[in-house]
């Protein structure tokens, strides 16, 4: 109706005046987590600054450590320039609805990156409202609402002790500080010196666990961690692991070097065996097959013991393999004594005495002058 009564120029002037006066708008951003909501509050500025985009502030993450203190941190490196952001907080259901500033800031490279809130200021089951703000640009601020009972991280269990309930049954007990036992859920892990992986079991409420059957020849290791259970909250954050405890001191633990040696030798030995089998298989494939015993009858009956003909070996190859025992003869003739005729026998012929194998040449002596 106002737009119809005013001219376009008058309506534009009225808009500019309203913008200079400064109106605030509130935008509610929803997220996938129903427990966390953020209210982004932007204050209008002069028209010449409206075109510049407002950079969002980093998200604040809060965790309550064993209900002793709470740390709320943010990523200070996400800012384009080094900025000391300020944090204010309050509880939604409280008499005082005003924000109070953090009294103990955490720093990263001399830039504020978190806030530590002490135990007396923690109200676990009231909605925690936290506001992050840029002091240089007051229009840059972000508000988040958190349910602290879902953000509790317990301290690691302590004083783990083992006792024998019977000859083959063990009981493990431990303690937790500052948190009621009914509000905690435990994860117990154990293994022996012959196991490669952990066996784990969830234990609710009571800080004890029994192992019904143990082997005296093994050495067992136990450890425990905890989290806030669904009765008191729905935290998914586990505590750190407790210090491990052992049972079976008379058993010598496996030497890690032997395990490493086994881990190397077993694969290498397996590969060597496979390669050897492959070579043996290829060698057997190249060897001719051994004929059945009944086929040997042909060697005696049909081929009359001629193995070469029976096996199919060529005649030329057979002859080349046969040994040659022939020898060349050496011919020897006797040298006559000095002054006598060479080879002259009783018959007066120089050829009457000679080797029986071949006729030697005949010689005649030339008389001396």
From Swiss-Prot:
The keyword Amino-acid biosynthesis does not apply. A motif (WSXWS motif) lies at residues 238-242. InterPro entries: CRLF2-like_D2, FN3_dom, FN3_sf, Hempt_rcpt_S_F1_CS, Ig-like_fold, TSLPR_D1. Its main location: membrane. This is Cytokine receptor common subunit gamma. Residues 23-263 are extracellular. GO terms for cellular component: cell surface; external side of plasma membrane; nucleoplasm; plasma membrane. Disulfide bonds join 62-72, 102-115. Residues 285-369 are cytoplasmic. Glycans are attached at residues 71, 75, 84, 96, 159, 164. It comes from Mus musculus (Mouse). It holds the Pfam family TSLPR_D1. GO terms for biological process: B cell differentiation; CD4-positive, CD25-positive, alpha-beta regulatory T cell differentiation; cellular homeostasis; gene expression; interleukin-15-mediated signaling pathway; interleukin-2-mediated signaling pathway; interleukin-7-mediated signaling pathway; interleukin-9-mediated signaling pathway. Residues 1-22 form the signal peptide. A motif (Box 1 motif) lies at residues 286-294. GO terms for molecular function: coreceptor activity; interleukin-15 receptor activity; interleukin-2 binding. The keyword Transmembrane helix applies.
């Amino acid at each position: 109706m106002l737009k119809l009564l005013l001219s376009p120029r008058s309506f534009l002037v009225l808009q500019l005046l309203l913008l200079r006066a400064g109106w605030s708008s509130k935008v509610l951003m929803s997220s996938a987590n129903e427990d966390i909501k953020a209210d982004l509050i932007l204050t209008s500025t002069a028209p010449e600054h409206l075109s510049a985009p407002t950079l969002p502030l980093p998200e604040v993450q809060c965790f309550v450590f064993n209900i002793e203190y709470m740390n709320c941190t943010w990523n200070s490196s996400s800012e384009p320039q080094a900025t000391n952001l300020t944090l204010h907080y309050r509880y939604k259901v409280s008499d005082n609805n005003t924000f109070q500033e953090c009294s103990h800031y955490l720093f990263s490279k001399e830039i504020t990156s978190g806030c530590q809130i002490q135990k007396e200021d923690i109200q676990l089951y009231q909605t925690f409202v936290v506001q992050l703000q840029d002091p240089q640009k007051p229009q840059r601020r972000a508000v988040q609402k958190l349910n602290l009972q879902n953000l509790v991280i317990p301290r690691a269990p302590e004083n783990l002790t083992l006792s024998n309930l019977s000859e083959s049954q063990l009981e493990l007990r431990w303690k937790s500080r500052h948190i009621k036992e009914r509000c905690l859920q435990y994860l117990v892990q154990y293994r022996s010196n012959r196991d490669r992986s952990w066996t784990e079991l969830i234990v609710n409420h009571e800080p004890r666990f029994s192992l019904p059957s143990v082997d005296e020849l093994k050495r067992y290791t136990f450890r425990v961690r905890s989290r806030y259970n669904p009765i008191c909250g729905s935290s998914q954050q586990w505590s750190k692991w407790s210090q491990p405890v052992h049972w079976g001191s008379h058993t010598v633990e496996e030497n890690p070097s032997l395990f490493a040696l086994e881990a190397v030798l077993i694969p290498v030995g397996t590969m060597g065996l496979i390669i050897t089998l492959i070579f043996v298989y290829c060698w057997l494939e190249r060897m001719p097959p051994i004929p059945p015993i009944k086929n040997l009858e042909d060697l005696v009956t049909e081929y009359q013991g001629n193995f070469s003909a029976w096996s199919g070996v060529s005649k030329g190859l057979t002859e080349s393999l046969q040994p040659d025992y022939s020898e060349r003869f050496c011919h020897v003739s006797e040298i006559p004594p000095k002054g006598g005729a060479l080879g002259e026998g009783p018959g007066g012929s120089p050829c009457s005495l000679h080797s029986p194998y071949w006729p030697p040449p005949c010689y005649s002596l030339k008389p001396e002058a």
